Amino acid sequence: MSGQRVDVKVVMLGKEYVGKTSLVERYVHDRFLVGPYQNTIGAAFVAKVMSVGDRTVTLGIWDTAGSERYEAMSRIYYRGAKAAIVCYDLTDSSSFERAKFWVKELRSLEEGCQIYLCGTKSDLLEEDRRRRRVDFHDVQDYADNIKAQLFETSSKTGQSVDELFQKVAEDYVSVAAFQVMTEDKGVDLGQKPNPYFYSCCHH
């Protein structure tokens, strides 16, 4: 794979108002939009080119609608996704329950999709810790259980946003290289652990 271009389909999932679009805006355009909230209808697509070692990686990011009325439509966009960033609002416990729904959906329909749990709006906790409604340790236990990775982010300050997307790209490149290596050796991938599946936390 040395020097090759790599394309990765990434889907953003989560309840409306959790800040999926803000997360993408911060990562792709390095900006935080302040103004009236606008619902994403269907999905918005944006691409970001980056480097991982000697490889050029293009993240094709699908920002899906969070409203339940667009739920069926969202399924169209995560078909074939290699990574899913499932977002929840750290100040809204119901958004974490909704995130669990999307994880179940992905596990049943896209088994090969690596999941990243993303707690949003961490800047609000810096202002007032009492606003936290989703316990960090509970989410970490859940992440460990589903073999996902956990990040707590802020689109306003940029906290852990670049790190999240960089990890998505690095993990995919590692898995792709692993698959090429094992295929070259004639190894049955079904007997090998997927190196995607480990958990870590970033504050």
UniProtKB/Swiss-Prot annotation:
Induction: By extensive retinoic acid treatment, in Ntera-2 teratoma cell line induced to differentiate into postmitotic neurons (NTN2) (at protein level). Its main location: cytoplasm. Its EC number is 3.6.5.2. It catalyses: GTP + H2O = GDP + phosphate + H(+). Its cofactor is Mg(2+). Regulated by guanine nucleotide exchange factors (GEFs) which promote the exchange of bound GDP for free GTP. Regulated by GTPase activating proteins (GAPs) which increase the GTP hydrolysis activity. Inhibited by GDP dissociation inhibitors (GDIs). The keyword Cytoplasm applies. The keyword Ribosomal protein does not apply. Coiled coil: none annotated. It is found in: Cytoplasm, Cytosol; Membrane; Cytoplasmic vesicle, Autophagosome membrane; Cytoplasm, Perinuclear region. Residues 30-45 are annotated as: Switch I. It is an enzyme of class 3 (hydrolase). GO terms for cellular component: autophagosome; autophagosome membrane; cytosol; endocytic vesicle; endomembrane system; endosome; mitochondrion; perinuclear region of cytoplasm. It is a lipid-anchor. The small GTPases Rab are key regulators of intracellular membrane trafficking, from the formation of transport vesicles to their fusion with membranes. Rabs cycle between an inactive GDP-bound form and an active GTP-bound form that is able to recruit to membranes different sets of downstream effectors directly responsible for vesicle formation, movement, tethering and fusion. RAB24 is an atypical RAB protein that presents low GTPase activity and thereby exists predominantly in the GTP-bound active state. RAB24 is required for the clearance of late autophagic vacuoles under basal conditions. Interacts with ZFYVE20. Does not interact with the GDP dissociation inhibitors ARHGDIA and ARHGDIB. This is Ras-related protein Rab-24. The gene is RAB24.
